[in-house]
Amino acid sequence: MAVLRSLLKSEDWMSLWIGLLIFALSLGLLVGADILGWAVKTNVWVSIGEALQPVSENYAGLGGGPSLVLTFLFLLILMTLAAKGLEANVPRFMSGFTVIFAVSYACWFLGHYAYIAATPDKLDALGIGWSMNLTGEAGYILALVVGLVGGAGIV
């Protein structure tokens, strides 16, 4: 019984179960069920209107903004259920998750700005003459800087 409790009541195991659930939902594509295709995808962008879109073409009519909201709500509900299972303070968790999601997605979004992220083969298609060539992963660098500055109490 103690082993079962540890499989359900530790953050490490809860992370594993959440990851496996999302992975299992994504396997729906193998049988033609596009279960998570509405999730948001961030493109390298020059114009903000081109930045967000659903992952799957099946949900292209949904648009980027609603796709981002649905992604946030899906993760908020899933993570809140996990936090409740871990007996966390749910209202505090939800507010903290919302702030962390907003800041981290803003970093990811800004990291995909074409002048930062475009690779040389994409410059002409984006209509720009230069780029820092960091790819979209520049959002990770930006998030690291924001985290270090925020963690140092500067923000």
Which residues fall in each region the model found?
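Helical membrane-embedded segments and adjacent short helical loop/helix-boundary regions
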Residues: 4-155
